[in-house]
């Protein structure tokens, strides 16, 4: 392939990539404005209440688990 053919092929393949990754452009009555809209993700890091004791846990009741499981 000649240099001109390779250059043309390169431009054809890279043009969609370059134009799709550019910021959004707004055309208003012949004036070109380039801008991007910002979005903010609001999140709460305080998902849980203050730590407290488990009211359903009673340590005086034995469990079915064995204390020593070594052979």
Swiss-Prot record:
Post-translational modification: The sulfation and the glycosylation are required for full activity.
Subcellular location(s) of the protein: Secreted
UniProt xrefs under InterPro entries: PSY (IPR034430)
Organism superkingdom: Eukaryota
GO CC annotation: extracellular region
Residues bearing PTM 4-hydroxyproline: 62
Residues the record marks as carrying a glycan: 62
Biased composition (Polar residues): 61-71
Molecular-function GO terms, alphabetical: growth factor activity
Residue numbers bearing the Sulfotyrosine modification: 48
Residues annotated as signal peptide: 1-20
UniProt main location, coarse: secreted
Tagged with keyword Zinc: no
Propeptide feature ranges: 21-46, 65-71
Region of interest called Disordered, as start-end residue ranges on this chain: 50-71
The entry's keywords: Glycoprotein, Growth factor, Hydroxylation, Secreted, Signal, Sulfation
Function: Promotes cellular proliferation and expansion.
Family under the similarity heading: Belongs to the sulfated-peptide plant hormone family.
Protein's name in the database: Protein PSY2
């Amino acid at each position: 392939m000649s240099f001109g053919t390779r250059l043309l092929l390169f431009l054809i393949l890279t043009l969609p990539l370059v134009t799709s990754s550019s910021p959004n452009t707004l055309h208003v009555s012949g004036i070109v404005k380039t801008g991007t809209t910002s979005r903010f993700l609001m999140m709460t890091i305080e998902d849980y209440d203050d730590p407290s004791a488990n009211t359903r846990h009673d340590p005086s009741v034995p469990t079915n688990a064995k204390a020593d499981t070594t052979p």
